[in-house]
């Protein structure tokens, strides 16, 4: 989001009345690919198409606060993959993560992931690093 949008968001969180009333939406992979005219799989596997889809959203709706901004995650698979979850992908379907544990009593067996090495986390971090200059150039 832009610096102005960030300041607006903080003001709202602080309980201030902001005029005009701001509008915000979650920007994420369930709607961006189809809205941008690309497959869901292309959105996840092409950094260029990912960036262009997010850029199209912020340029089409410049007054909307999009959270978290440029959505870099791979559906709802990023975090589970870091804990060892197998993920399944379809061309125009949302990816899904398979169970790692089958009982809450097993939660202590999970190993804390390393974002630089585990699952899809390195891809998310690297995508944002690779596009940081372009995102900033777009004012975000």
Features from the language model and the residues they span:
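Catalytic cores of TIM-barrel enzymes
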Residues: 1-140
């Amino acid at each position: 989001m832009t610096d102005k949008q960030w300041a607006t968001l903080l003001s709202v969180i602080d309980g201030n009345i902001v005029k005009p009333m701001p509008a915000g939406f979650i920007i994420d992979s369930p709607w961006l690919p189809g809205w941008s005219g690309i497959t869901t799989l292309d959105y996840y596997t092409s950094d260029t198409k990912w960036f262009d889809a997010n850029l199209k959203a912020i340029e089409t709706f410049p007054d909307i606060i999009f959270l978290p901004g440029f959505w870099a995650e791979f559906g709802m698979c990023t975090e589970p993959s870091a804990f060892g979850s197998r993920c399944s992908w379809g061309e125009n379907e949302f990816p899904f993560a398979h169970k790692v544990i089958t009982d809450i009593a097993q939660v202590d067996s999970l190993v804390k992931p390393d974002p630089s090495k585990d699952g899809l986390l390195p891809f998310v971090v690297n995508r944002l690093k690779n596009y940081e200059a372009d995102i900033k150039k777009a004012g975000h």
